[in-house]
Amino acid sequence: MRLIQTLSSCLCTGITALFTACSQAPQSPIDSVDPFIGTGFHGHTYPGATAPYGAVQLSPDTRKGNWDACSGYHYSDSTLMGFSHTHLSGTGCIDLGDILFRPSLQTPLVFSHSDEKASPGYYSVNLREAGVLAELTTTPHVGIHRYTYKKETEATLVVDMDHLLDNEYMYEGWVKRTGDNELTGMRRTRGWVDNQYVFFVAQFSQPFSSMEQPSERQAVLTFDTTTGKPIVCKVGASIVNEENARLNLEQETDSYGFDFDAIHQATRSDWEKELDVITVEGGTEAERTNFYTALYHSKIIPNIASDVNGQYRRHDMSVATIPAGRRQFSTFSTWDTFRAWHPMMTLLDTTLVNDMVQSLLDMYDASGELPLWPLSAGETGTMIGYHSTSIIADAYLKGIRGYDAEHALEAMKISAEKNKKGADYYIKEGFIPTNIKKESVSCLLEFAYDDWCIAQMAKALGHMDDYETFIKRSQNFINVFDGSTRFFRGKRQDGNWETPFDPFAIGRSYTEATAWQYRFFTPHDVYGLTQLFGGREAFIADLDSLFMVTSEVVGDLVDVTGLVGQYAHGNEPSHHMAYLYSYVGQPWKTQEWTRRLLDEMYQPTPEGIIGNEDCGQMSAWYILSSLGFYSVCPGSNQFILTTPLFDKANMKLGNGKTLVITANQPDKNKYITKVTLNGEEISHCYITYDQLMQGGTLDFTLSATPDKRWGTAPEYAPYSYTEQPTVSIPYIANDLDLFEGEITAELKSTTPEAVIHYTLDGSEPDENAPVYSEPFVLKETTIIKAKGYKKGFVPSRTYSIQATKAVLRPALSIQPTKHGVAYTYYEGEFQWVADLQKAKVVETGTIPEPSILNAKLPDHFGYIFTGYIYAPEDGVYEFSTRSDDGSVLYIGKEKVVDNDASHAAIDATHPLTKRLPPLRLALFRGLRG
């Protein structure tokens, strides 16, 4: 098989480096960091200056308003708009870009990458056409600029609070002169999150000679630079108020005055300390650059949200003060980072972990729910699951407990009960109907894992009733497993599968993925998943296929990148999959694939991150995998072992101890034959958190050929909730949704020699129920329930499906007076079809058929069409709407197709008589078309 690599040559941009093997470690890890890595392709990182976890990220903005503008900078650009003080790193959504400074009236400013320099805490660019050298550094809350103008260049500086990276709504904002060398300002916006406040106080190394204000939110300053001295500007920022912005500025920079180099050196020292937490020896220069840049990227997010006096803005917009010694954090991409970044931090920085858990709990206290994706002082609601529960449970079960655990469990339980994204159906029915909610399969699978986390937390605290509730819910993944395809599939409310099914398609039932990329997501119960597949052999064959099938996908989704077969390293749902071989007795394949992914998915170039860096998750995968272990199931306290990338690594652990990791010639050997910790052999293919935190020496003995004995015995496999052989849930392969006359049903199980007992009256089957022996015919609407049994196996879950006979309801006896459909046209911003009813009617009329071609705007409009459908004969008809923003189709009073607020289409069937039933179609179009 040839690796299908999305890092094609056409993406490369002109930086070419030749790296050779070298056994010597660099003098300082900071010298191996390249902040330009990830600024090309879709990495969405920024090259500018920031302190570790800094509240200020001072970086150039080269574009806005499109997906590759998420960080404000893209390496393919050659002009910039200026330097703003807040940025996101590696995200898939755009926001921030606050407080833009531009050292020229020219816009945009032309630059060359050959004139850029970047290192942790420092960025510079020589803007030759504008005649100014721009240099940037930061402290945690202050951005520091140094502009060196050519003598013949007028020293002009534009301060722009109107600048936005995305189409945000500006509630208010202003810039004011508050001294001969001082400006203050603020703005409040609604973007990815509502009510984003930012305040600043800017002080300059010399008075400005003039100031003009083109608008209330802009200022143009001029300076006398005949002395030849550069202009240094210090900008203190806060999301609380102007007074705190000033206090941040004073406490973090007053002792340095306007000495740019001294401030830069202090921040560089902070970075040297942060990057010294893991040092590696051996490997190539390229691998060390990848490693230390990954470590750097893992320490710029989350961001400090509290000021130097401890004040911070809460999610209810109130201002509170944290206890001394603590920090409040925001910018958590929990859907991404629960997988590897947070488990990595439990090893490296337990103080940080405690602060983060306290921050999450404070967000719960202010809003009534643990956050999914908090930003600034609000919740974006982006992505799925409730993965704050994983973060908290993982910390608590590892003994990191600097918070009220009972309160944490309460927050976890309440957040899991919120009626969001189909959670009401998930709790009541055990699955989320795909005809009612989008992303139903992905949501269910991630809810199930999060519920397992809550169960473990409850058990540790002695709440066994809660444990039983949530551990039962954690097995709901079984309900959407289709044995006929061996995929998790979208299930309609009546128990029938969504059709047609294409595992290579970007479907409505999955989040940023195909069915392949969610096929193996049961991190808490991999053994249970193998039982659904029919056993180890079937599971291994399908896991092999993941990496071997075509990388073509049906549909367009920019997140699905870094494809090897259908494994997509550029997006997080795939990140654990190479490690699953260690659960089924083939750890040597884990070692093969992790090495290949390390080698081919990360490069020391701007395009070198194969997808969104995602707030440290892509980097954490690289760091942990290159050290030789990875957390597949946070909360289990286990890390799956794999082959290290480096000869030696030193980890400074969060408890003050040091772990030394050694391996013999990993450049030549990628297979494990033996692992010891402080001289004691580890036979399992995993190591525990407690073992790692002992410190000492973790030694890997490697070979050039696979050792198919090490770690292969079933008793050496990592944790799974299911411990005993279990019969897979039965299934019916054909669709029983609507049938005319009669239909045949055939029950099967992936478990060899399983005996299926079933009922046709809706009752629960047991071993006294009839034994299935051959297909049976249904002539009426019937609820089929089935359960699989086998000696020595735990019985399966009950399978339930409704076979529905089509009932042709008479249509209205009416004779339409016109051909076509009536329409009502609306304009505005809509999230749901119901929002149309609140909008102002722009136009009404009649057209031959439903169409949006006459819309007066390219986006932000909606239609409601009404009329009648002509059915040429009685029968069952199929309907679909192909809108990717939101649409709902009613026939009579029945909702037939529900694509509301969705970005994927769904089909439906409905019986019609030959007469004319009424139709109502409502749809809207947003920014994405």
Model segments located where?
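C-terminal motif of bacterial Sec signal peptides marking the signal peptidase cleavage site
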Residues: T20-A21
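Aromatic-lined ligand-binding clefts that engage carbohydrates, nucleic acids, or primary amines
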Residues: L747-S749, I869-A871, G875-L889, L919
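Beta-strand signatures of extracellular beta-sandwich domains
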Residues: K674-T676, V755-T759, E878-S880, V888-Y890
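Extracellular Ig-like/FN3 beta-sandwich strand-entry sites
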Residues: P230, G695, E742, K779-I783, ...
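Accessory carbohydrate-recognition regions in carbohydrate-active enzymes
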Residues: A25-S390, Y396-L445, C453-N479, T485-F488, ...
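Short proline/glycine-enriched turn/loop motifs at strand-loop junctions of beta-rich domains
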Residues: K151-T153, D667-K670, S749-V755, R882-G886
